């Protein structure tokens, strides 16, 4: 027993990262030999793990890029200087799920307690990047509401968004040759890019523009309040409360029981809705939501799906029950801004959108039978210890089930790669799908399925994810031995059954409508308005 406790103690202590050590590594120049070893390591791991490494670039071209990179390193570099050299090579594979992360500064060990739970000055903002201009899309801060939706960011601590875009654009990619995802990806990553440029700071000064006026605004880091301070606030409120509870009539035991039961029932309903529809506490939104855009007509409905990661997949029973109960004639599925999620989620959804048996995807392609053991790579020591038995069994079962197809590819059967029937509550009437450049991964696969089966009319932008599939599924994160940069790699090629001859591009809309800066500032939705007008004219 003592040996077991000692083992767990050692694991815990070795897993506790030193901030000072991390910051020192951030500033340390790594030797040429060590960096060249990281280049070789990255290349070897990609060849070993990635099932479609040469989908959009040839083996010869990629080999040459890695060789040239190794030869071009002639002086020591910091981890982030090295990042700007190796990440463009990784992004040249043109797989949007595969990415590298920079090495970030953090608080020193001496101030670890002070900064624990604090939030970076920019962490409350979400953005839109339109025509090389950065706008605030959402400000979640409760304390500082000066910068609201529509405010243009001209610079942060003197760094212009366009300069940031030019510097970091080579370091990330979408799937294939499609460029529609790039502005959306940049908008999602822009805070991390500014953090990398500015370092660990307590405040930033933003130069902004709103309603034709330019101004400067300083935002400070938010610190978590101490328990002592919270107690003082509670005591103050208690002393200054307007109504003394002793002056109110006390409820009888029966009334108290009725009140408790009502509160319990209400909380139960709220909990059910949040769990099943995937409630996001940070943004106060649901992953899946049914809306009726015309107040006087319930026959037109919008199914807004923000992601396929949150909520229960069985929620579609509830959703399509609502659609049937309202005799919905026209269903608008809004997949804009949807980065993807679970394969079993979109597979489940597809069963409500077809009227005959179908196969949703092809079997997944992997590099070798032991590929799933790579899931342990990049995990902390405690995670490896506790996860090893489960991942070991899972990897063994999946590896044994893999078989070679007629082209010699090693493929793993999926639930979605078998014939399946529609659900009893399947929707068979008119479907419109709204897409944009952030319709990615699983959201692009369900789009390919509906487009390939001529099941829907598509309106908006070309999807960011390609028509013919993606490399994702399970994605371990590797840590390069010397630079300590992190590399995420997809292990499974997942392709929809429906395919197109044009490789490297997304699902293209039947009606192309790209929102303008004016649409964003005026909060108008031309794509949705087009569909609603078409439905109105048809009726």
Model-derived features: positions:
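Flexible, low-complexity junctional segments that flank or bridge functional domains
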Residues: 17-331, 335-365, 381, 467-479, ...
